[in-house]
Regions:
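Conserved flavin/dinucleotide-binding core of flavoenzymes
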Residues: 4-14, 286, 338, 352-502
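N-terminal glycine-rich phosphate/pyrophosphate-binding loop and immediately adjacent elements
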Residues: 15-157
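Short glycine/proline-rich turn/loop motifs
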Residues: 18-21, 81-89, 234-248, 389-398, ...
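Rossmann-like dinucleotide-binding core of oxidoreductases
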Residues: 120, 130-168, 316, 347-368, ...
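Active-site/ligand-binding neighborhood in enzyme catalytic cores
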Residues: 124, 131, 159-276, 284-286, ...
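Charged, often glycine-rich, active-site loop that binds/positions anionic groups
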Residues: 130-139, 278, 283-295, 434-454
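Mid-domain catalytic core of redox enzymes
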Residues: 273-387, 418
Length: 502
């Protein structure tokens, strides 16, 4: 099917074939994120001598979870001590895995990382726009059904007015009308009106039941064409049609950092933590990396034949790096996005118990952008953590300029618009991560555009003598773990080829 252009997935054809490594050949890997650990794992299997230097005291890089008792200090000095209950967590970075990210799924299975479903599309969540529906949230299924119904009625009018006769044949005209009636839940006159037919999609005023009052009552207050044409409505519906956002999705059982921990077990003993790299030099014979142990202050030079560098470009561009001017220009040309995520722990699962919301996302045009509900431990008593903000662009810019406490307050204010009865009442504690303030990344992920890709991408992913870069920034699957892994496989495959030719 893939050869016919159907069911296409990312470019993963299995683990790399790195046969024939020269005895004693060595590689130093900078960064113990997923790209770095995969590179080390596959190179070690091939016979290379590998060492990983990692700035932090843990593996995973941006593959990260915050738990109760954790402490996080952002740039500017603000420190948060996470107060979540035991077993709860917040994923500040990646948090979901599309079904077609075959590389990541392959290695999760190979490394024993257990996955569970991530509920992406939930018809019963909320959709909110300050410019539509009187500024009040409506259920997602209601807005989506009314969008379809209003658009179908409008198009049916055009067909019946013969406005499309030049575009469709007589046969297709009848088929189109039939499709519009079915898709848009129109009546016999091609009108979108209150009916049991429409309620079967958007919900009832009284749902079907049993006994004397079992007959359903159709919902009467349909939303207008004007309201459903609000950009928040159609963009939220279209969100789930994007290839990267389509179901099925997955998440690791127990938190996203389980992936980093699973990878780290495969390269146990190869990682040096608390290693701050300050300089990377190279010549025709090898690579020398100067790094400092942040715990002791001791500075060391590490040498190897080759280097796989997975440090984010936002950091790498500030380092003493001996590469060509073209490579350095490419590194400095790519900006990073600055998303803000906020994890709020609530005393109980009111979204489940009071509103029948089990997983999925509610959307809003406020700065928080969305609320995402946990996919694990459903129906359980006790506290749970929901994602109270995934702010982007100007919303993220404003939130990043606040203190962590101020961010929590904004999340509570704006989240209360969607859950007015429970949000503040059930709030326990929270944590936030503004990616532009993360000291070891200074941004969430690389943001290429057409011009920068055309000018710099091939330089960035090419080998610079004995140094090759890897990470989501060196891929066309940017901001996803899949991109990091695919770039890693590509980088070490080319490094291996170069090593055999040397």
């Amino acid at each position: 099917m893939t050869t016919l252009g159907h069911a296409a997935e990312t470019q993963f054809h299995g683990p790399p074939n790195l046969q024939g490594a020269r005895p004693g050949a060595s590689v130093i890997v900078l960064g113990a994120g997923l790209a770095g650990m995969l590179a080390a794992y596959e190179l070690t299997r091939a016979g290379y001598k590998v060492k990983i230097l990692e700035f932090q005291n843990r593996p995973g890089g941006r593959n990260w979870s915050l738990r109760g008792g954790d402490t996080y200090t952002e740039m500017g000095g603000a420190t948060q001590k996470v107060g979540y209950a035991a077993g709860n967590y917040f994923n500040p970075g990646p948090w979901r895995i599309p079904h077609h990210h075959r590389t990541l799924l392959h290695y999760c299975k190979a490394f024993g990382v257990s996955l569970e479903p991530f509920i992406q599309y939930n018809h019963n969540t909320w959709m909110h726009s300050s410019e539509a529906f009187g500024g009040k949230p409506v259920r997602f299924n209601t807005a989506a059904a009314d969008f379809e119904g209003n658009i179908a009625e409008l198009l049916a009018k055009s067909v019946n007015a013969k406005a499309l006769d030049d575009a469709v044949t007589l046969e297709d005209r009848e088929r189109l009308l039939e499709a519009l009636k079915g898709w848009g839940m129109l009546d016999k006159d091609y009108k979108y009106v209150s009916s049991l037919r429409a309620s079967a999609h958007r919900g009832y005023d009284r749902p079907p039941g049993g006994g004397v009052n079992g007959a359903p009552i159709a919902s009467k207050d349909l939303n207008s064409l004007h309201d459903v044409l609000d950009p928040q409505v159609w963009s939220s519906i279209g969100f789930f049609m994007g290839h990267e956002m389509q179901t099925t999705m997955f998440q690791p059982v127990g938190g996203m950092d389980m992936i980093g921990k699973g990878f780290a077990k495969q390269v146990e003993g190869l990682i040096t933590y608390n290693a701050k790299v300050s300089k990377v030099a190279q010549d025709d014979k090898g690579v020398a990396v100067t790094w400092t142990d942040t715990a002791t202050g001791k500075t060391t030079d590490a040498k190897a034949d080759w280097c796989v560098c997975t440090i984010p470009l936002s950091i790498l561009g500030q380092m003493d790096l001996q590469v060509t001017d073209e490579m350095m220009a490419a590194i400095k040309a790519v900006p990073y996005s600055g998303q803000v995520k906020i994890g709020l722990e609530m005393k109980r699962r009111f979204w489940e118990e009071d509103e029948s919301i089990y997983g999925g996302h509610s959307f809003t045009d406020q700065e928080i952008a969305l609320i995402s509900y946990p996919n694990n431990n459903m129906f359980k008593d006790g506290p749970a953590v929901l994602l109270g903000a995934f702010a982007r662009e100007m919303g993220a810019y404003r939130l990043a300029g606040m203190t962590p406490e101020q961010r929590i307050e904004v999340a509570l204010q704006q989240g209360s618009v969607l859950h007015p009865a429970s949000y503040r009442k059930e709030f326990s504690n929270g944590a936030s991560v503004a990616w532009s303030r993360v000291p070891w990344a200074m941004g969430c992920c690389a943001r290429w555009n057409e011009d920068t890709r055309k000018e710099h991408y091939q330089t960035l992913v090419g080998m610079d003598r004995r140094i090759v870069l890897a990470g989501e920034h060196a891929s066309y699957v940017g901001c996803w773990m899949e991109g990091a892994l695919l770039s890693s496989i590509d980088a070490i495959t080319r490094l291996h080829k170069r090593a055999l030719e040397a």
